[in-house]
Every structure is written in C-alpha cells, then in structure tokens.
UniProtKB/Swiss-Prot annotation:
Ca(2+) binds at residues 140, 142, 144, 146, 151. The lineage of its organism: Eukaryota, Metazoa, Chordata, Craniata, Vertebrata. One of its GO terms (biological process) is microtubule cytoskeleton organization. Gene3D superfamilies: EF-hand. It comes from Homo sapiens. InterPro entries: EF-hand-dom_pair, EF_Hand_1_Ca_BS, EF_hand_dom, Myosin_RLC. One of its GO terms (molecular function) is enzyme regulator activity. SMART domains: EFh (SM00054). GO terms for cellular component: cytoplasm. Keywords: Calcium, Metal-binding, Repeat. The gene is EFCAB11. Coiled coil: none annotated. The keyword Repeat applies. The keyword Calcium applies. Residues 18-53, 91-126, 127-162 form the EF-hand domain. This is EF-hand calcium-binding domain-containing protein 11.
C-alpha cells in the first residue's frame, strides 16, 4: 500500500531540490488542462511516470478518499506529500531488503537458524543462543525452518503500524 511503512516512522528523509522539482514537473505535465489539480486518471499517469507502475484501484481509491471533498482532485501540495510518503516507504523497504540480503550470505532467498545465529553473533554477541532460537521461531511465521523476506520484513515492522 502507499503509506504502510512510511506512516509508522518519523520523517527522516527529505527529497533533494532536484527530486522535488521533478515531482512538480510531473504534476504539471499530468495536469494537462492546467486545472490546478490532478484527477483520478491524471494521478495514475503521474504514478506511472514517477514509480514505473500503474497503481491498483485500491491504491487510487485510498488516495482519492483522503483528499479534501471540497476539491475536484489532488492539489500540488497534497500530491507532493503523497509522493514523499511513497518514496519514504520505498526507501525503508529497500533498507530492509539490504539488511536481509546481508544476512542471506548464500543468496537463497531465506534465512535458516544457522544464518540467524551468525547474524546475531555479529550484531548482539552476548545474546544467549536460547533467545536467538526463540526469536527465530517467532519470526518463522509458517514454521517451515526458513525465514523468508516477508517473514523478516513483518518482524521488523511488527508493532510499528498505526492503530
């Protein structure tokens, strides 16, 4: 979803001036009739231009339902806020992927208990092995002996979502 990871974190990232200019240019390019706002279709085009994929109906519905009902579409300020949050979420997910890949030394796409033990020896050497085993069992949500990226990402996000 658009805001799932970024919502829970404090704002720690700002767009560079050139990136900010690009977002404004995309807004203007998608606002073909110079209405001052993006319609639903304009917004979908902007997402394709900035992120390289067509947003799902659910994503677009979520964004459109969050805008001021007194406006006909997404104003520039709202658009910039949406894009910033999306970029924050994208950046966070990339960081989680990077951490997972660092622990997945054999590039299998999952972590075993041994991978977990090795990782914890590096980042928390005094942690008892019993605790590492408990953490592994908790993170391995389907109890298949492997921690997938999804399991890993879920564990890192656990308790951080807004209520």
């Amino acid at each position: 979803m658009f805001f799932s990871e970024a919502r829970a974190r404090s704002r720690t990232w700002e767009a560079s001036p050139s990136e900010h200019r690009k977002w404004v240019e995309v807004f203007k390019a998608c606002d073909e009739d110079h209405k001052g706002y993006l319609s639903r279709e304009d917004f979908k085009t902007a997402v394709v231009m900035l992120f390289g994929y067509k947003p799902s109906k659910i994503e677009v519905d979520s964004v459109m339902s969050s805008i001021n009902p007194n406006t006909s579409g997404i104003l520039l300020e709202g658009f910039l806020n949406i894009v910033r949050k999306k970029k924050e979420a994208q950046r966070y997910r990339n960081e989680v992927r990077h951490i997972f890949t660092a622990f997945d030394t054999y590039y299998r796409g999952f972590l075993t208990l041994e991978d977990f033990k090795k990782a914890f020896r590096q980042v928390a050497p005094k942690l008892p092995e019993r605790t590492v085993l408990e953490v592994f069992r908790e993170v391995d949500r389907d109890s298949d002996g492997h921690v997938s990226f999804r399991d890993f990402e879920y564990a890192l996000n656990y308790g951080q979502k807004e209520a």
